[in-house]
């Protein structure tokens, strides 16, 4: 399996619960390396641009409002099969449907406040990483 990079966001609900370290430990425990990371407060414009793919969806405004409701922890994860591995660690979008032991089952409150975001494909990962970490801010380890 190839070494990949994926974007991961610990959302405002999980940041507010003070579980950033526990979530990062799960990534590292699964063999993923953190190649870049930053704590940020997204502006409305940043959130709207990042989630533009969902602009026509009925949940778009709620998603943007949620993502700007508090700080987020944004990281680039690197490792073999990083995209799928991260998605497996996160669990189903709806925490009620997420398998026990996944990040969303353990830390998310609802389908809206679902603790984490992860890229869904190599193409999306490249775009999302460039959005939050332009230039030389990502390092192989």
UniProtKB/Swiss-Prot annotation:
It catalyses: a 2'-deoxyribonucleoside 5'-diphosphate + ATP = a 2'-deoxyribonucleoside 5'-triphosphate + ADP; a ribonucleoside 5'-diphosphate + ATP = a ribonucleoside 5'-triphosphate + ADP. Its EC number is 2.7.4.6. One of its GO terms (cellular component) is cytoplasm. Keywords: ATP-binding, Cytoplasm, Kinase, Magnesium, Metal-binding, Nucleotide metabolism, Nucleotide-binding, Phosphoprotein, Transferase. The keyword Protein biosynthesis does not apply. It is an enzyme of class 2 (transferase). Its cofactor is Mg(2+). One of its GO terms (biological process) is GTP biosynthetic process. The active site is at residue 117. It comes from the Bacteria. InterPro entries: NDK-like_dom (IPR034907), NDK-like_dom_sf (IPR036850), Nucleoside_diP_kinase (IPR001564), Nucleoside_diP_kinase_AS (IPR023005). Its main location: cytoplasm. PROSITE patterns: NDPK, NDPK_LIKE. ATP binds at residues 11, 59, 87, 93, 104, 114. The keyword Nucleotide-binding applies. Gene3D superfamilies: Nucleoside diphosphate kinase-like domain. It is found in: Cytoplasm. GO terms for molecular function: ATP binding; metal ion binding; nucleoside diphosphate kinase activity. Homotetramer. Belongs to the NDK family. Major role in the synthesis of nucleoside triphosphates other than ATP. The ATP gamma phosphate is transferred to the NDP beta phosphate via a ping-pong mechanism, using a phosphorylated active-site intermediate. This is Nucleoside diphosphate kinase.
